[in-house]
């Protein structure tokens, strides 16, 4: 337990929090080029074939990012926007690809939560 005098002289050490998405260098998004588009299977209680892409970011880092929702048009050399956010049942996947920007198209026939999947507002039915 430090004395008041010691605290006045030195102060307390700040605890540094570790970044959950270090490859983005503190930016909210980063552009990158798809190096490889592949599928992964999730951890134990879940079963699926999840679509992921290995992306080389503009800062030189290579990350594995998740392609959200059903159906995508990504292939090798596609340019994508990457944001942080892990996928809980895919170990090592700590980033998401933003749908509806650059080469990643929005999700077809999406009606709800459209802003998350890059879909424009549909025309009103007559």
UniProtKB/Swiss-Prot annotation:
Please list every transmembrane segment annotated in the UniProt record, as residue ranges.
none
Gene Ontology cellular-component terms for this entry are: small ribosomal subunit
Task: Read off the InterPro entries from this record.
Answer: NA-bd_OB-fold, Ribosomal_uS12, Ribosomal_uS12_bac
What residue ranges carry the coiled-coil annotation? none
Q: Name one Pfam family in it.
A: Ribosom_S12_S23
- For region Disordered, the annotated ranges are 1-28, 106-126
Q: Where is the composition biased (Basic residues)?
A: 9-19, 109-126
**What NCBIfam families would the database entry show?**
rpsL_bact
Q: How does it assemble?
A: Part of the 30S ribosomal subunit. Contacts proteins S8 and S17. May interact with IF1 in the 30S initiation complex.
Protein name (Swiss-Prot/TrEMBL): Small ribosomal subunit protein uS12
Origin species: Opitutus terrae (strain DSM 11246 / JCM 15787 / PB90-1)
> What's the gene?
rpsL
């Amino acid at each position: 337990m430090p004395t008041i005098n010691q605290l006045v002289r030195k102060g307390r050490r700040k605890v540094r929090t570790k970044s959950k998405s270090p490859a983005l260098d503190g930016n909210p998004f980063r552009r990158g080029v798809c190096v490889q588009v592949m599928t992964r299977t999730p951890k134990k209680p879940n079963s699926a074939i999840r679509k992921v892409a290995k992306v080389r970011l503009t800062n030189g880092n290579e990350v594995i990012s998740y392609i959200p929702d059903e159906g995508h048009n990504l292939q090798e050399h596609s340019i994508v926007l990457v944001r942080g956010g892990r996928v809980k049942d895919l170990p090592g996947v700590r980033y998401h690809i933003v749908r509806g920007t650059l080469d990643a198209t929005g999700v077809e026939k999406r009606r709800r939560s459209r802003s998350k999947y890059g879909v424009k507002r549909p025309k009103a039915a007559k």
